[in-house]
């Protein structure tokens, strides 16, 4: 009778009208209130029933340390450990064949309801049937406590405290013994603590990253500065006529930054062994809704969204402060004030705390084989995504295959293959396991091909317009312009005032994904003679299959002309730039220079410049790199592949602007004034030109094979001390003069174990004394010297959500690393 009464009940109309969320269709079959009331009499709460029976022979304190989340079946009242545990008894209970399925479970940690059949959370309110059942369970669990429950809970709490004390004392004893062996003084003020993190529902990918960020003490130091109220900063004026800097009063930081600061303080100061990062995770989900829904996600993508979100909040603070400094609201701004604000924002005198800690710079060097002109492209990064070659696939390196393509292939097929291989090799392939991620990969390939076609059409129109401008202007002023190319290795251009024929640019429009994995449409220019008041942010492709530079002569622009800016949405607004082009702007050659910007506003800034660089040293590094060309199973070899020297030839030839001008001015010049573009063979190499204080390396284990994703389980060796010098330019910044070493010490690892469909993220973190040299480098810009290398001793811990265990360094080095965190020591 009880069962019939329960099934006959319907959801009240009031509840259905109040709830805006769609109700689960398995609610009627998965909910049995009568069975629940019987099962919840004299029951031990928050303990897995199956683990309790299976673990009689196991050590009790060991199980207490793991503390898995417990889920209550709403059909029969069974309590089982969740998906984040090793046994997953709650999931096994659901998959057990029965006459009536047990779909619904209730979390005894956060009181959320989950449907295994729908594989999603069910929303409820207190007025409907599900909400009433949850309220009843919460009362029975002791939220509204009865006297016998108080006694029972008090007894359990006493036992837990005893076990906690014993395990804590044992850990401290082991820790002190290991420290005594290594002769490290225990200093509570400078020591970094290691704690467990509660799993909020398939959030191990989040916990593993947070464990490593919590072991970055310089991040906590900078966040303390950011949180200081009434912070006043000074920004140098962009106009040289103005001598006094602009004083900007910054607002309080954004919610994500505040949540991050609060989390780091809890990890350092909280006396509890386990921290629940609920507020920080909710702020991340607000910035990126893809992390909602308790599905397994990718750790590297989480790190990217987290750092980019905090950086965006910092830039917003500065922009609002500049507006307030001009005494204007954001609603009404005249054009003059808007231009001033933009000029100050482009000055970028205040790098965000994210860039100060994790920010580095890559320089792509391209040299024409004919005229030996060297051009440099600077690109900022927060982490490096390194390719992992799979021996089992039996495929050659995709980049090498693209370089060796011949002109005999059809253009359409060649472009499709280049786009496809580009996504496989150097882009950050989404590594989630959900169907959403796979669909996103398909859309990405289609979008890239579409953008490529659109860019070709825009480029053709732009070429046609500029050829008309150049031809008309050349007929009148051809006798006034003269260009001298004195010799190989350098470009020396002579100007006559008022002659603007030689003010040409090389335009590159390429649809690519940058080193940080963010797709963008990039306009790249090599303008040797541009105005310092309007330096343009430019970029060039970082892939060998995009090595064919496409150039166009451009009419000189007025000093007040609009910029063709790099758009984050990938759209190149070329119309506005063409409206402001003029033909008679006189420019003084002495005032023209190339300016290298350190932009922190875009995730991956790229600056293009033509250098009078010595071709013999343009591709040299701080240290020898050839020793890493053979060992394919090491992180050094991955860096070697990432920074290897490439040949741009055949279908990937370079459109050289210098060779094009030389041919136009030579005896074979076209009488009609038409420019015939010259494509030449070239060399290209990407190296680190700014060593970041904290180096983050991402091993691309999740790779795209067609429309599917696969994981490369190959073990990659990584050292405890990494020398980045073989992969740095000779003029690398943040490196002491005449130094041939750039040393980093490993302090954190994110490991992914399992397969694409069923895996788990864990972290290895190093408890150590905070580095003084790293703090001085980040806070004051003091470059570490050779004689000042610090000790790298410390204790390693393996953290799997709430479980923390001390491990030797050998276990860390044998792990299947997915993310590596290195801190600068020299």
UniProtKB/Swiss-Prot annotation:
Sequence position, cross-link Glycyl lysine isopeptide (Lys-Gly) (interchain with G-Cter in SUMO2): 139
**GO annotations of cellular component type:** cytoplasm; nucleus
Q: Where in the cell is it found?
A: Nucleus
Identify residues that carry Phosphoserine.
188, 414
| Database matches in InterPro entries | Papain-like_cys_pep_sf (IPR038765), Peptidase_C19 (IPR050164), Peptidase_C19_UCH (IPR001394), UBP16 (IPR030849), USP_CS (IPR018200), USP_dom (IPR028889), Znf_RING/FYVE/PHD (IPR013083), Znf_UBP (IPR001607)
One Pfam entry for this protein is UCH
Chain intervals with Basic and acidic residues compositional bias = 148-180, 392-407, 526-537
Q: Report the active site residues.
A: 204 (nucleophile), 760 (proton acceptor)
Q: Where are the zinc fingers (UBP-type)?
A: 22-141
Q: Which reaction does it catalyse?
A: Thiol-dependent hydrolysis of ester, thioester, amide, peptide and isopeptide bonds formed by the C-terminal Gly of ubiquitin (a 76-residue protein attached to proteins as an intracellular targeting signal)
At which positions is Zn(2+) 1 bound? 24, 26, 115, 118
Summarize where Zn(2+) 3 binds, as residue positions: 73, 76, 93, 102
Q: Where is this region: Disordered?
A: 1-23, 145-184, 392-456, 526-553
* Record keywords, A-Z: Activator, Cell cycle, Cell division, Chromatin regulator, Hydrolase, Isopeptide bond, Metal-binding, Mitosis, Nucleus, Phosphoprotein, Protease, Thiol protease, Transcription, Transcription regulation, Ubl conjugation, Ubl conjugation pathway, Zinc, Zinc-finger
UniProt EC number: 3.4.19.12
PANTHER family recorded: UBIQUITIN CARBOXYL-TERMINAL HYDROLASE
Q: Which family does it belong to?
A: Belongs to the peptidase C19 family. USP16 subfamily.
Free-text note regarding domains = The UBP-type zinc finger binds 3 zinc ions that form a pair of cross-braced ring fingers encapsulated within a third zinc finger in the primary structure. It recognizes the C-terminal tail of free ubiquitin.
What is the protein's given name? Answer: Ubiquitin carboxyl-terminal hydrolase 16
Annotated organism of origin = Rattus norvegicus
């Amino acid at each position: 009778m009880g069962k019939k009464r329960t099934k006959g009940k319907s959801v009240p109309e009031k509840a259905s009208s109040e709830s805006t969320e769609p109700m689960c269709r398995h609610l009627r079959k998965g909910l049995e209130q009568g069975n629940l009331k019987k099962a919840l009499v004299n029951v031990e709460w928050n303990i897995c029933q199956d683990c309790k029976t299976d673990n009689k022979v196991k050590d009790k304190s060991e199980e207490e340390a793991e503390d898995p989340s417990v889920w209550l079946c709403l059909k029969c009242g069974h309590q089982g450990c969740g998906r984040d545990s090793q046994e997953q008894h709650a999931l096994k209970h659901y998959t057990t064949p029965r006459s009536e399925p047990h779909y619904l479970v209730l979390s005894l940690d956060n009181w959320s309801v989950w449907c295994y059949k729908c594989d999603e959370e069910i929303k409820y309110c207190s007025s409907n049937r599900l909400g009433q059942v949850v309220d009843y369970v919460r009362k029975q669990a002791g939220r509204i406590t009865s006297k016998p429950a108080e006694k029972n809970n008090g007894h359990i709490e006493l036992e837990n405290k005893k076990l906690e004390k014993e395990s804590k004392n044992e850990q401290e004893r082991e820790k002190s013994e290991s420290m005594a062996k290594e002769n490290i003084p225990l200093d509570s003020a400078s020591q970094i603590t290691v704690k467990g993190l509660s799993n909020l529902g398939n959030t191990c990918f989040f916990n593993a990253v947070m464990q490593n960020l919590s072991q970055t003490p310089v991040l906590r130091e900078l966040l303390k500065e950011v949180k200081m109220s009434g912070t006043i900063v000074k920004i140098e004026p962009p106009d040289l006529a103005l001598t006094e800097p602009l004083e900007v009063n910054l607002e309080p930081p954004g919610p994500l930054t505040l949540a991050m600061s609060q989390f780091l303080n809890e990890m350092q100061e909280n006396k509890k062994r386990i921290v629940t990062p609920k507020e920080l995770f909710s702020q991340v989900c607000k910035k990126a809704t893809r992390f909602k829904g308790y599905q397994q996600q990718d750790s590297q993508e989480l790190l990217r969204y987290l750092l980019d979100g905090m950086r965006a909040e910092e830039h917003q603070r500065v922009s609002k402060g500049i507006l307030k400094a001009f005494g204007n609201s954001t609603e009404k701004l005249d054009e003059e004030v808007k231009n001033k604000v933009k000029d100050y924002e482009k000055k970028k005198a205040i790098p965000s705390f994210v860039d100060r800690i994790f920010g580095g710079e890559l320089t792509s060097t391209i040299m024409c084989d004919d005229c030996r002109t060297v051009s440099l492209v600077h690109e900022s990064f927060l982490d490096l995504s390194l390719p992992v070659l799979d021996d089992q696939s039996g495929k050659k390196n995709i980049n090498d295959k693209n370089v060796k393509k011949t002109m005999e292939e059809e253009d359409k097929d060649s472009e499709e293959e280049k786009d496809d291989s580009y996504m496989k090799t150097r882009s950050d392939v989404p590594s989630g396991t959900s169907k959403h991620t796979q669909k996103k990969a398909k859309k990405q390939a289609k979008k890239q091909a579409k953008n490529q076609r659109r860019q070709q059409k825009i480029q053709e129109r732009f070429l046609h317009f500029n050829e008309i401008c150049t031809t008309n202007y050349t007929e009148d002023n051809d006798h006034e312009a003269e260009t001298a190319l004195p010799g190989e290795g350098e470009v020396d251009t002579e100007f006559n005032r008022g002659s603007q024929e030689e003010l040409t640019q090389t335009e590159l429009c390429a649809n690519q994904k940058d080193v940080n994995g963010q797709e963008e449409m990039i306009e790249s220019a090599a303008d040797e003679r541009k105005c310092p008041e309007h330096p343009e942010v430019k970029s060039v492709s970082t892939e060998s299959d995009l090595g064919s530079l496409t150039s166009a002569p451009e009419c000189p622009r007025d000093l007040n002309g609009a910029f063709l800016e790099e758009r984050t949405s990938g759209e190149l607004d070329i119309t506005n730039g063409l409206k402001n082009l003029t033909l008679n702007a006189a420019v003084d050659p002495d005032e023209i220079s190339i300016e290298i910007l350190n932009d922190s506003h875009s995730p991956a800034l790229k600056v293009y410049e033509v250098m009078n660089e010595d071709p013999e040293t343009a591709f040299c590094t701080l240290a020898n790199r050839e020793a890493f060309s053979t060992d394919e199973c090491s992180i050094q070899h991955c860096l070697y592949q990432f920074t290897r020297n490439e040949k741009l030839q055949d279908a990937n030839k370079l459109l050289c602007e210098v060779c094009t001008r030389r041919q136009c001015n030579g005896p074979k010049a076209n009488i009609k004034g038409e420019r015939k573009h010259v494509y030449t063979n070239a060399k290209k190499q990407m190296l680190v030109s700014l060593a970041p204080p904290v180096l983050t390396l991402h091993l691309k284990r999740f790779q795209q094979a067609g429309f599917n994703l696969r994981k490369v389980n190959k073990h990659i060796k990584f050292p405890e001390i990494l020398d980045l010098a073989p992969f740095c330019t000779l003029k690398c910044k943040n490196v002491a003069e005449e130094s041939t070493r750039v040393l980093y010490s490993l302090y954190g690892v994110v490991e992914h174990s399992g397969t694409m469909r069923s895996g788990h993220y864990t972290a290895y973190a190093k408890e150590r004394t905070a580095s003084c040299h790293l703090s001085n480098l980040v806070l004051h810009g003091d470059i570490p010297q050779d004689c000042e290398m610090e000790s790298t001793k410390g204790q390693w811990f393996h953290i799997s959500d709430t479980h923390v265990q001390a491990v030797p360094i050998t276990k860390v080095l044998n792990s299947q690393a997915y993310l590596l965190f290195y801190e600068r020591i020299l």
